[in-house]
């Protein structure tokens, strides 16, 4: 492990006092932590921070992720996930998703198990979950998120999707899985939408099953996870429900409900997919109720 990773591993330890951690940073002046303008924190699987690296009068900001925190991953499990980060990112890029560059990733041992340290390109914007919740967010910005997702999911790389049956219905199977939720998306100032979460790479085999699946990371069964993360209809429905949930005021729900219906109706989605998604939207997302039961989306 190089010096920079050794430093970061030390800073992650819970048995070192904050004063000692500050001394570690002072003794390593080439790595500077700053309080970022964007709010970062802990997700279900990862801790995320912004780093400012200063070397030879140049400054570069990167995202530092600690993936698999508190998941008690074995070394082999962490290594399998780590080695799939770059290939998975390339699969997404090939299919039209904007994804940040990964500079470096490494498996690191901690007291609670093995985690993956990942250093990635910083996209200067907040995630779309926070954006949706902000009262000051422009109306068109929220609508742009859904419209851009559908634009990507209907591009030429998605023209001939394989049909698979789940829950007694035929769905359009994506050639990859993707955890499409608002917290994993960033809309930048130029209007480009970026998918920024590669951990737990959701790659599929040619037969349409998961290349890597780990119950430590995913609470859903493999089939249910396929429905909401690897079918076009399931991905869109999940996004619609999350978008309606994260509006800042309840009285905005009906306005966005109708706008979302218009976006689906006028989208290039196949007609049978449109009708199914609209029916699910009107009926309160029965598919998602079946998938998640009592769990949260």
For every predicted segment, state its role.
Residues 96-151:
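Conserved structural core of kinase catalytic domains
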Residues 67-79, 130-137, 171, 207-211:
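Short, flexible/disordered intra-domain loops and linkers
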Residues 54-60, 109-114, 189-192:
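Short, solvent-exposed loop/turn segments that connect beta-strands within catalytic domains
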Residues 34-90:
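ATP-binding glycine-rich loop module of kinase domains
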Residues 166-234:
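Catalytic activation segment of kinase domains across protein kinase-like and atypical kinase folds
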Residues 1-37:
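Juxta-kinase regulatory segment immediately upstream of eukaryotic protein kinase catalytic domains
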Residues 143-173:
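An alpha-helical support segment within catalytic cores of ATP-dependent transferases
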Residues 222-297:
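Helical subdomain adjoining the active site within ATP-dependent kinase catalytic cores
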């Amino acid at each position: 492990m190089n010096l920079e990773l050794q430093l970061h591993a030390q800073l992650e330890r819970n048995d070192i006092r904050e004063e000692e951690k500050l001394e570690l940073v002072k003794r390593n002046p080439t790595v500077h932590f700053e309080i970022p303008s964007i709010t970062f924190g802990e997700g279900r699987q990862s801790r995320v921070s912004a780093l400012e690296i200063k070397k030879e009068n140049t400054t570069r900001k990167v995202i530092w992720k600690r993936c698999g925190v508190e998941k008690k991953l074995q070394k082999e499990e962490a290594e399998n996930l780590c080695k799939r980060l770059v290939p998975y990112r390339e699969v997404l890029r090939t299919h039209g998703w904007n994804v940040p560059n990964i500079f470096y990733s490494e498996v690191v041992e901690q007291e609670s198990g093995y985690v993956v340290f990942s250093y990635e390109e910083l996209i200067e914007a907040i995630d779309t979950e926070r954006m949706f919740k902000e009262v000051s967010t422009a109306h068109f910005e929220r609508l742009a998120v859904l419209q851009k997702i559908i634009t990507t999911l209907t591009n030429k790389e998605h023209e001939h999707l394989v049909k698979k049956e789940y829950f007694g219905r035929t769905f359009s199977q994506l050639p990859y899985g993707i955890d499409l939720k608002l917290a994993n998306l960033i809309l930048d100032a130029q209007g480009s939408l970026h998918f920024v979460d590669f951990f737990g790479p959701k790659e599929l085999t040619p037969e349409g099953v998961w290349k890597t699946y780990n119950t430590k990371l995913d609470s859903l069964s493999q089939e249910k996870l396929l429905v909401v993360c690897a079918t076009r209809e399931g991905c869109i429905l999940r996004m619609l429900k999350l978008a309606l949930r994260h509006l800042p005021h309840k009285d905005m729900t009906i306005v966005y409900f109708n706008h979302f219906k218009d976006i689906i109706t006028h989208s290039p989605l196949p007609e049978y997919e449109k009708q199914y998604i609209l029916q699910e939207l009107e009926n309160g997302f029965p598919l998602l109720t079946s998938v998640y039961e009592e769990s949260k989306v």
